[in-house]
């Protein structure tokens, strides 16, 4: 039974997240329904990142085992045909070794968070960026962000319902980049805790507003307490942009 690697783009707005849930539609569920329509039997689709409700992806990676070998391009096109008109697109499909695992074979995940730092309402970026009307000091945000780089106990920045066995994670990158009225927060790690990126972003916005200093952010990290976290940024601005493999 051949295994396929899929690269998937989606608008997470209408979904309860990647993972199948009882309380609403999911990206995983939509893909599995499409695969079942093609193959005539239940197909499990496993993703590299279990994105939350409202979070988007430019290049989510998933794998699935298909009972018969199909040309990768044909599988891609068939999945896209069955997914329409949902905001999910299968960008590529390729046959990979049987031991490839989209989640467990990944060595790094890359996310971008978009902040629209302007007074005007959003028009084209509704549900795709977080509008923060107060002018943010992006340089101060970037400087403070470097305090979070490295291996730390990120209890402060993880959801209270996070099921990870350990709060320890190694953060490889956390850059704050301004381009006109848009601020992009770019972050990379092997893996992240539940709500870690959005928790870090919300706290960095407090730094940008002048409510916190870099020392305050470092103190919040050191507190290892969820109550020490700043606000959690909304899911609208978060994108899974790349997953790395050996």
UniProtKB/Swiss-Prot annotation:
The keyword tRNA processing applies. The keyword Isomerase applies. GO terms for biological process: tRNA pseudouridine synthesis. It comes from the Bacteria. The active site is at residue 52. CDD domains: PseudoU_synth_EcTruA (cd02570). Its EC number is 5.4.99.12. It catalyses: uridine(38/39/40) in tRNA = pseudouridine(38/39/40) in tRNA. Pfam families: PseudoU_synth_1. InterPro entries: PsdUridine_synth_cat_dom_sf, PsdUridine_synth_TruA, PsdUridine_synth_TruA_a/b_dom, PsdUridine_synth_TruA_C, TruA/RsuA/RluB/E/F_N. Substrate binds at residue 111. One of its GO terms (molecular function) is RNA binding. Keywords: Isomerase, tRNA processing. It is an enzyme of class 5 (isomerase). Homodimer. Belongs to the tRNA pseudouridine synthase TruA family. Formation of pseudouridine at positions 38, 39 and 40 in the anticodon stem and loop of transfer RNAs. HAMAP family: TruA. This is tRNA pseudouridine synthase A.
